[in-house]
Amino acid sequence: MIRIIGIGPARDDITIRALRALEDSDVVIGYARYIRQIEDLLDGKEVIRSGMGDEIERVELAIEKHREGLDVALVSSGDPGVYGMANVFFQIFDKYSGIEFEVIPGVTAVNYAASKLGAPLHDFAVISLSDILTPLSEIMAKIRAAAESGMIIALYNPLGKRRKRPFREAVEILRSLLPPQTPVGIVRTVDGAPDVRIVDLESLDESLVDMSTIVLVGNVTTYTRDGQMITPRGYAVETPLHELAREFYEENPLGKASGPDENCEFYPCHFEGQNCAFCYCPFYPCAEGSTGGRWIRDRGVWSCQDCTWIHTDSAVECVKRSLGDIISGPDDLMDKKRELLKLRRECLMRG
């Protein structure tokens, strides 16, 4: 049996299934750095180390040992199916007959990085910036498509000592498509504790990354809070409808006329020239901070003091276009909260 084993990105993240697979192996084959990560688990086993770029030779050697009747572990960092040894194994094994194999999944580098950053992943794309095997034009097309679609983007192999062009071109594309304040998570792991930081896209610099780094680029809904990077899914948090909001939507079920309400005694409550069509936000409480709102801690109150989005012309125009399909009166603000939050997300993603 050949077991293609994902050992995870760090020593403490190896799975029980991977441990058992290693225990059942006679021979362990892998890149020298990955072998060091699990060396204490390999007593009494034949261990074969190789260098970077020797992937095909590792597979051929694993098959050779297997045909000798030995159980072989072919180890891969992270998950073997994500830029790991599973892919190259399946390119080679069809040359031979009677090969028994099993793929043992592992914790991927992107999932590990996400766990260190908070909850940055929603719909996301994983893209390697290594152009050793993939044309640079193909990589950049994927970057552009992912950014245009609003996906979170995880970049593997962002920067080599001599391979800098892919990262520079990727950043240029991202900056042309995403707001400069878009959060970017950077997790670098070698042998010790991970180096974790969050910057905005405008500040993303190649001095912060290398080949041991995962870069996670957020989208327009991603925000940061207390050192965590969060991309919300849009769960509906139920709270009672405020009586003033009820009164407003009884009189104005689809909001008031667009534009500033300079006759209001509180105008401007956010900024000069604000659009007052929705004096009371129809999404309250959205309970996610992508537009600046936040919980008043230990009070159970959602504060919109720093959220100006619903008072921008583009937001009002987008919301008015579909709000009538969802609500006909104030009770719908609670009863149809999920549909409302989907509308909010749609308008945010449109920009």
From Swiss-Prot:
The gene coding this protein: cbiH
Catalysis performed (reactions): Co(II)-factor III + S-adenosyl-L-methionine + H(+) = Co(II)-factor IV + S-adenosyl-L-homocysteine
Name of this protein: Probable cobalt-factor III C(17)-methyltransferase
Family: Belongs to the precorrin methyltransferase family.
Pathway stated in the Swiss-Prot or TrEMBL entry: Cofactor biosynthesis; adenosylcobalamin biosynthesis; cob(II)yrinate a,c-diamide from sirohydrochlorin (anaerobic route): step 3/10
Keyword Metal-binding: no
Molecular-function GO terms, alphabetical: methyltransferase activity
Main enzyme class: transferase
Keyword list, A-Z: Cobalamin biosynthesis, Methyltransferase, S-adenosyl-L-methionine, Transferase
NCBIfam families, per the entry: cobJ_cbiH (TIGR01466)
Cross-referenced SUPFAM superfamilies: Tetrapyrrole methylase
Protein purpose: May also convert cobalt-precorrin-3 to cobalt-precorrin-4.
InterPro entries: 4pyrrol_Mease, 4pyrrol_Methylase_sf, 4pyrrole_Mease_sub1, 4pyrrole_Mease_sub2, Cbl_synth_CobJ/CibH_dom, Precorrin_MeTrfase, Zf-like
Its EC number(s): 2.1.1.-
Gene Ontology biological process terms from the UniProt entry: cobalamin biosynthetic process; methylation
Record has Transferase as a keyword: yes
